[in-house]
């Protein structure tokens, strides 16, 4: 808001430009964030960012398996059981909305990949997720190149 970039981002997304967020960047794609208060986000995807309600250690730091909700272009070239690296204390809610592409289990289903149309978010860090993360990023690049 401070740099008046939100209208520019909104215009680019409306124009069909591919837009991706990682970790906090994914969280910014949703409607509200409750980390340290209540904040309006970009609203490109439905849902809110809420704290974990689990007996497990928070922040969630470590490797978890992605569980895709169906066939998706991001799966191309991935192993049968792809693991990715997470570092976060908040997550997208609800976990069962149609924009959730893949989840990970951390005492609850945690949305790990969300997206629709030209908007995509990774809650985990693909750049820290070894060959699986590299493959996911390669798939994103191929998708964007194909779509123009």
Give the residues covered by each predicted segment.
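Amide-donor transfer/coupling interface in amidating biosynthetic enzymes
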Residues: 10-14, 48-148
């Amino acid at each position: 808001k401070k740099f008046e970039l939100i209208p520019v981002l909104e215009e680019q997304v409306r124009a069909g430009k591919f837009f991706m967020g990682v970790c906090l960047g994914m969280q910014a794609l949703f409607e509200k964030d409750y980390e340290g208060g209540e904040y309006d986000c970009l609203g490109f995807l439905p849902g809110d960012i809420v704290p974990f309600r689990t007996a497990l250690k928070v922040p969630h730091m470590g490797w978890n398996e992605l569980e895709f909700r169906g066939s998706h272009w991001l799966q191309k070239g991935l192993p049968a059981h792809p693991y990715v690296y997470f570092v976060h204390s908040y997550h997208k809610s609800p976990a069962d909305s149609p924009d959730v592409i893949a989840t990970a289990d951390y005492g609850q289903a945690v949305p790990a990949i969300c997206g629709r149309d030209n908007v995509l978010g990774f809650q985990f860090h693909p750049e820290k997720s070894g060959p699986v993360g590299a493959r996911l990023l390669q798939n994103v690049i191929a998708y964007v190149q194909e779509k123009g």
